[in-house]
Amino acid sequence: SLEADYARYCDSVGKKYNEEYAFKVLDLFPNFFRPGIIDILKNIKKKKKKNRLIKVIIYTNNMGPHYWTVFIRKYLERKVGKVFDYIISGYKPGTNINKRTTHQKTVPDILRCTGLNKETKFLFIDDQQHNRMVHEKVTYMKIHPYNYGIQFKTLVDKYMASNLINILPKKERETFKFYILNYLSAGLIGYNYKVTKQEISKKDLKEEQRLSKFIEVFIKNKNTRRKKKRKTISRKSKKRY
């Protein structure tokens, strides 16, 4: 069957496939990530060095496996260094992946999953409306959704033209291309993939600037900083004899 043949060829790739290789595959398609996200994360990292109270959380409703979110975090940190403090992945009842109690995004769940105190103030950035994140401790930034797609043939051709294909013997490459294209085109990846946008728009670039500025203002705002508790030192009067 097509699925069996596809699995066989993927297995031959998988024997030499590792995390670093997967990172290099992602490097072929930088537009899969929102424009400017790497520079934004680098800037946040600089801010964190000056203020250890700044924490960065990945809070996602993606229902893929937890390791996929971890993989994306590792990929981004490969570019910018350690920047994320917590990952809160999709709610999966009956598992111990995290301490979420609902599919909805909520402040109580963030506190439960991270252990942060209830006085913590958040900048919440999302392209969807999450009503339970409208909260006195939350500055909510709803951003324009970023969509970018590649036709399967373009995606496969770019991969085949890179040196990453060298993990397969030359005599097997065209056969691999045939099976992977047919597998993708047959809709066997588990969901309906539609390419609606294949270029970065002016709106995407403007949103990058707006996002950078919003983060900068939030971090600078004294009212959004957590204050460190000062130790009170009692001074005893010295007795002179």
Predicted ranges, named:
Residues 65-239:
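C-terminal cap/substrate-recognition subdomain and adjoining C-terminal extension
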